[in-house]
A protein has these predicted regions:
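Carbohydrate-associated surface elements
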Residues: 44, 185, 203-206
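N-terminal subdomain of nucleotide-sugar transferases
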Residues: 1-65, 256, 417-418
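Conserved donor-binding/catalytic core segment of Leloir-type glycosyltransferases
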Residues: 207, 224-242, 248-251, 263
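Membrane-proximal helix-turn-helix segments that form the acceptor-binding/catalytic region
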Residues: 122, 129-133, 159-179
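Nucleotide-activated donor-binding/catalytic signature segment of Leloir-type glycosyltransferases, i.e.
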Residues: 229, 265, 272-299
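A charged, aromatic-enriched C-terminal amphipathic alpha-helix characteristic of glycosyltransferases
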Residues: 219, 377-408
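Short hydrophobic beta-strand element within catalytic cores of glycosyltransferases
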Residues: 307-310, 328-339
Length: 418
């Protein structure tokens, strides 16, 4: 259990929030359930489709309640589906809008500010503004390393812009009292941009509680998507970071193996590209692209799949990260097929939960997919059981939530920031 004490007033800053599917949603719910008063400063939901969710948008601030937490939404520009300019405007619009409006919208001083920092890193700027005005300490939970992620995804390559982003990153790290990282390998990249006194701590992601082994009813809707044979399922964002070119290459090499089905559940900027490639190469008998489903239904998709697929592009930054998808796969006790390297591949190997090919080797991914398709059911079950055991040992949700709660309380008890 975390250190007991009075309930805290916690401001959570993140550009994305429910109904967008990110780990910050569960963090808000858990902290609220533990008796704290949580306020979320976020934008209008438009991820991953690139258009605002029905009922949102416009240029007015919106307030709502979610699981007992107060949610403040500031106006932003939607990210669009394929325009780098719109994506850049989306990134900038939240940082500017929230930084200007937050001092007026967050009327009382929070005990502590938690930034759930995904891409872009600029989403942390409103927290720094509030720290300077109200004196609250900031805990920055780094999910993506910038500017490395910016270069790796190819969104911006201009060295002047990258240099400007690096300056902003230094500013954010300097003004964060605790920097938490979701992967231990992040530390060596953060240290040169942080100050010597920066307090950097390991805080991994954990799976939401609904990610668990489940029994699927005979009449469950999810069953209609699975055909007889060997089903490989990819879940989540279909974006540039996912290395879909490698996956497509593997599918093409196994085109004649009609017993192997590739199922994609999710949406994102590269969905249209993938659908076009499937049509172009005559892969409709091998591939299904289903679109997005509620996160709570994903364990049932996972249970029906023979293997779950995890892929990332061949970039240094992606070898350092642990995609939160991996924890959800492990928590459901399913074997994993990876086109990954670095930390994620190391976890998969240590857990004995599946096989991993290099991220840029479609022929190796195809070979491993074929190998797993020929494994006895008993062997696949062993891999799934090992995945679940590793998840419970290394990514226990209550343990790491206790750590987060303790650190937030620690900052709340320190002298006012200046």
């Amino acid at each position: 259990m975390g250190v007991e004490g009075r309930p805290l007033s916690i401001l959570i800053v993140c550009q994305y929030f429910s109904p967008e599917n990110f780990g910050v949603n569960a963090i808000v719910a858990e902290l609220q359930q533990r008796g704290h008063s949580v306020t979320v400063l976020t934008g209008m939901p438009n991820y991953p489709s690139g258009v605002f969710v029905d009922g949102y948008g416009g240029w007015k601030v919106r307030r709502e309640t979610w699981n007992g937490a107060m949610v403040i939404r500031v106006p932003i520009i939607a990210r669009g589906r394929s325009s780098r300019l719109k994506l850049a405007l989306n990134y900038l619009s939240y940082a500017i809008s929230a930084s200007i409006l937050a001092p007026f919208l967050v009327k009382t001083r929070p005990d502590v500010i938690l930034v759930y920092q995904l891409s872009p890193v600029t989403m942390a700027l409103p927290a720094i503004v509030l720290k300077l005005i109200k004196g609250s300490k900031v805990l920055l939970w780094v999910q993506d390393i910038w500017p490395e992620s910016l270069r790796a995804t190819g969104i911006i390559k201009n060295p002047l812009i990258v240099g400007s982003v690096k300056f902003v990153v230094r500013l954010i790290y300097r003004d964060s009292s605790i920097i938490a990282v979701q992967s231990r390998r992040f530390i060596d990249f953060i240290r040169p941009l942080a100050t010597r006194a920066s307090d950097i701590r390991y805080l991994p992601n954990t799976a939401d509680r609904f990610y668990r082994p489940v029994e699927v009813a005979p009449d469950a809707t999810e069953r209609k998507f699975f055909r007889p044979g060997f089903n490989i399922l990819f879940a989540g964002n279909l974006g540039s970071a996912q290395g879909l070119e490698t996956v497509l290459g593997a599918i093409m090499q196994l085109k004649d193996h009609k017993n192997i089905q590739w199922i994609f559940v999710g949406d994102g900027r590269c969905r249209g590209w993938l659908e076009h490639q499937v049509r172009e190469h005559g892969l409709s008998d091998n591939v299904q692209i289903l679109g997005a489903f509620p996160p709570e239904r994903m364990p049932y998709f996972f249970a029906l799949a023979d293997v779950l697929l995890l892929s990332l592009r061949d970039e240094l930054i992606f070898s350092l990260t642990v995609p939160s998808k991996l924890q959800t796969y492990l928590a459901c006790g399913r074997p994993v097929l990876g086109a990954i390297s670095g930390e994620a591949a190391n976890i998969l190997s240590t857990a004995s939960a599946g096989l991993a090919a290099p991220p840029d080797a479609p022929e190796r991914l195809a070979e491993m997919a074929l190998t797993m398709s020929r494994m006895p059911r008993e062997r696949l079950k062993e891999l799934g059981d090992a995945a679940l055991e590793y998840q419970r040992r290394e990514f226990d949700r209550d343990h790491w939530l206790d750590c987060l709660e303790d650190w937030l309380r620690e900052l709340s008890e320190q002298p006012r920031a200046s």
